[in-house]
């Protein structure tokens, strides 16, 4: 009987440990991702020259496949590509992005309203978009 209860307890504990998410469920490991650091809230423009200078192989993908992720969700983007679905000189991306603030730091506190200043992060004002 004790063996049965111990087995049942261990089974339940192991089930709870697998129910936690890693936070990287949005990643599709068959795709390439490039990191952009954002430190100001507003509309941002990334043009052909910026991507090319960063070493991103622009000839290998179509603009219809470009996605942008930040703050644990997909961000809408406006792509100006001349209608040819390729990223050429003069083409650019526009998107709205927010700087890092206290949105995720609130998870550190038992009471989320206990954060000192919700407009500023405890750790860094820069956030990465992919």
Regions found by a protein language model. Give the residues of each.
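Short amphipathic, basic-aromatic surface patches that mediate peripheral association
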Residues: 45-57
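Bacterial Sec-dependent N-terminal signal peptides
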Residues: 1-23
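Structured catalytic cores of large enzymes
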Residues: 20-40, 54-130
């Amino acid at each position: 009987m004790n063996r049965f209860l111990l087995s049942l307890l261990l089974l339940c504990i192991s089930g709870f440990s697998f129910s936690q998410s890693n936070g990287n469920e949005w990643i599709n490991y068959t795709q390439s991702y490039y990191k952009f650091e954002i430190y100001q809230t507003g509309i941002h423009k990334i043009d052909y020259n910026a991507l090319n200078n960063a070493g991103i192989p622009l000839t290998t993908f179509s603009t219809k496949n470009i996605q942008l992720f930040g703050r644990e969700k997909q961000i809408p983007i406006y792509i100006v590509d001349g209608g040819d679905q390729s990223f050429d000189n003069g083409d650019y991306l526009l998107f709205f992005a927010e700087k890092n603030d206290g949105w995720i730091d609130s998870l550190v506190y038992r009471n989320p309203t206990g954060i000192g200043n919700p407009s500023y992060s405890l750790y860094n004002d820069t956030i990465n978009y992919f």
